[in-house]
Regions:
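Short amphipathic alpha-helical segments
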Residues: 1-5, 73-76
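Helix-turn-helix DNA-binding segment
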Residues: 2-41
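Residues within the DNA-recognition helix of helix-turn-helix
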Residues: 14, 45-48
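Residue-level detector of secondary-structure transition/capping positions
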Residues: 26, 39, 50, 69-70
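Basic, Lys/Arg-enriched C-terminal extension of HTH/homeodomain DNA-binding domains
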Residues: 52-76
Length: 76
């Protein structure tokens, strides 16, 4: 079978942005403020990302997104 390049992310750009910011240590409220969204909207993006990734919580979602190369790990 021919290599067709990288597999597209199952997540939306906004979900990826939220997970990236969570990985950097931001809370849902901080992410919402920075992006002009409510905390509840951010939580909704994260919940949907968890469902798409097949994980149970935001920590697992961040770990899977980093492990699968969807987002970059934050600097130490």
């Amino acid at each position: 079978m021919a290599n067709r390049g990288p597999v597209p992310s199952p997540l939306t750009p906004r979900q990826l942005e939220c997970l990236s910011r969570i990985a950097s240590g931001e809370t849902s409220a901080e992410i919402g403020e920075a992006l002009g969204l409510s905390k509840r909207t951010v939580d909704h993006y994260v919940l949907n990302a968890c469902a798409r990734l097949g994980v149970r919580n935001r920590t697992q979602a961040v770990a899977k997104a980093i492990g699968d190369g969807m987002i970059l790990a934050p600097p130490p």
